[in-house]
Amino acid sequence: MPSKPRIYIETSVISYLTSRPSSNEGIRGCQYFTRYWWENFAEQQFELVSSPIVQQEVSLGDRAASQKRLEVLEKLTLLDTRKETLDSLSDDLINAGALPLKARIDSFHIAIAAINNVQYLATWNFKHIANINKIPLIQQVCRKAGYQPPILCTPQQLLMEDF
């Protein structure tokens, strides 16, 4: 039996999975797709991975809410990446203009997934990660550094795929 593809679960996915339904219709839709994908497909189709950086991010904020996020994260394998390697690819992404300096944490998510040869990165961050205008440059920078870039996608997009 072939192994499942790995998917890096970024902070926004965990936040949408565990938060109360938003009053914003668009965000509420993203929350719905996230919960539906998570409950019906995520573990069946993928090996779920994340990182200590996500762990740090989800531990911030309201104590009860952060506890719910951390409980989800406990079930995932956390990928460890050498700081020097992580910083190098992150710097490459920022220096190439794929992400702005203020999005350093977002560059870490992409770098961790690429360095660990993770096939997919699930996110709702369209500004810096799943930005259709930046994806080609992100891919180019990762490949130039010797890494296969992950496919940057949302849980909604994953519902439309046949794995």
Map each language-model feature to its residues.
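Short, well-structured N-terminal submotif of metal-dependent ribonuclease cores
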Residues: 1-50, 59-70, 95-101, 135-138, ...
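Generic structural signal for residues in well-ordered beta-strands
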Residues: 48, 78-79, 152
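Residues at the C-termini of beta-strands that transition into short coil/loop
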Residues: 52, 82-83, 155-156
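Active-site neighborhoods of divalent-metal-dependent phosphate/nucleic-acid chemistry enzymes
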Residues: 77-135
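C-terminal end-helix/capping segment
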Residues: 130-151
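Short, C-terminally biased terminal segments at protein or domain edges
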Residues: 146-163
